[in-house]
Design a protein with these regions (language model features):
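Acidic/His- and Gly-rich active-site-bordering loop/insert found
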Residues: 2-102, 126, 310
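A structural preference for short, hydrophobic beta-strand core positions in alpha/beta folds
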Residues: 50-51, 284-287, 319-321
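Active-site metal-coordination/substrate-binding segment of hydrolases
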Residues: 69-135, 141, 352, 357-363
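Short beta-strand segments
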Residues: 75-76, 134-136, 161-164, 187-189, ...
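Acidic/histidine-rich catalytic neighborhood of metal-dependent amide-processing enzymes
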Residues: 107-177, 222, 380
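Midchain, well-structured core segments that form catalytic/ion-binding scaffolds
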Residues: 147-297, 308
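Active-site-adjacent substrate-binding region
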Residues: 212-222, 293-339
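Zn-dependent metallopeptidase/amidohydrolase metal-coordination segment
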Residues: 315-378
Length: 380
């Protein structure tokens, strides 16, 4: 039974977590918060392991027992996007039903909900299930150190709940579909020369070639398929009277359908051929790929099941597509059921206005505990 005393302790713990800098320049803060969760699960008698996987801080893996396969994976990230000193400058604060602070909904409250929900589940229920939790230290930089480890664990799991924040709405919005992302970055090398003599001096503009690439990349935008293309950073040249010898651009393609990423790759190969024909050398400076999270039939059936559980609480389990990335993008490729947005409701992540709705905490904890109990009942 979730009591007021328990909720008060939740908010005290949340204040402590939020007031610890946890950006990529503060791995000691990420470690400190990981140790908080490790110690809490140690007291519960669970198996815990802090794994040093990179310079961002440790990844915490928690299990209720050793097992070949796990019924449930709960996961969240301990890092934020904010630089060291942010927590001191704008610490945790509460205003009526709203709590503010760096990383409060993205996603320290979600990580804490995982712990508190499991504390609400009766021991006899936990005995029936094999449960795994992963607290990652590097989601905000693309999970570059933790992804391989997390995917290996996901292969052993049936259901995954990701505790990114639910979207603030009359009925909090969860997520089973996220766009994938293809990251692009290129440096262009032309040939410098006086702009007034470029027709005869052999000068080749790196900026002109880059501009051609941008115009072609923009053709990938599709309202019908909800594909976006954005070149967000460009630079180049040294003066108006000098044909630019160098230029650089970076951007990304976001897509629901994997074939849209393949279409982009075909275009990039074509653009390389164009650059070669115009005398511009192109070097790739950024690359990265995240698959889209698209719901399996099993996931959609599980959403119906969660809606049935929420109906017992007088609520609905609502879902909405999201354009942003999370660990669910890659985890969903490795197991049959994956649902994101299981944390308390909030908005405005990555900004000074980031907030969490305090009255969404108890429903988030209760639903998670109910979902765990239902898994045990299903297992028999």
């Amino acid at each position: 039974m979730l009591t007021q005393t328990t909720l008060e302790q939740y908010f005290r713990d949340l204040e402590m977590l939020v007031n610890v800098d946890s950006g990529q320049d503060a791995p000691e803060g990420i470690r400190r918060n990981a140790e908080f969760f490790r110690d809490a699960f140690d007291r519960m008698g669970w198996l815990t392991e802090l794994q040093d996987i990179g310079p961002t801080g440790p990844c915490l893996v928690v299990r209720n027992r050793e097992a070949e396969h796990y019924d449930l994976l709960l996961t969240g990230h301990l890092d934020t996007v904010f630089p060291k000193g942010t927590a001191a400058r704008r610490p945790y604060r509460e205003e009526e039903n709203t709590a503010y602070g760096p990383g409060i909904c993205d996603m320290k409250s979600g990580c804490l909900t995982m712990l508190y929900a499991l504390q609400e589940v009766p021991a006899e229920v936990l005995e029936k299930l094999n449960i795994l939790l992963i607290f990652q230290p590097d989601e905000e930089i693309g999970s570059i150190y933790s992804k391989e480890l997390m995917c290996a664990w996901a292969e052993k799991c049936r259901v995954c709940l990701v505790f990114e924040a639910a979207v603030d709405a009359p009925s909090p919005l969860h997520c089973v579909q996220r766009k994938g992302m293809l990251r692009l970055g290129f440096r262009f090398y032309g040939r410098a020369g006086h702009a007034g003599s470029m027709l005869t001096n052999g000068a080749v503009s790196a900026i002109s070639e880059m501009a051609y690439w941008i115009s072609r990349i923009d053709t990938l935008v599709s309202r019908e398929k909800n594909t976006t293309a954005n070149v967000g950073l460009v630079r180049g040249g040294i003066g108006n009277n000098v044909v630019a010898a160098e230029a650089e651009m970076s951007g990304e393609i976001r897509f629901e359908f994997p074939e849209e990423a393949e279409k982009a790759k075909v275009l990039i190969r074509e653009l390389y051929r164009h650059a070669e024909a115009t005398g511009v050398r192109v070097e790739r400076t950024l690359e990265g790929y995240e698959p889209p999270m698209n719901p399996t039939p099993q996931t959609l059936a599980y959403v119906d099941h969660l809606n049935t559980l929420e109906a017992q609480n007088g609520r609905t389990f609502s879902i909405r597509k999201r354009g942003g990335l999370s660990a669910a993008n890659f985890l969903s490729q490795h197991l049959p059921i994956c649902v994101d947005g299981f944390g308390p409701a909030g908005e405005k992540a990555h900004s000074e206005d980031e907030y969490m709705l305090m009255d969404s905490v108890a429903p988030s904890i209760r639903l998670t505990a109910q979902a765990i109990c239902a898994l045990a009942k299903e297992k028999g």
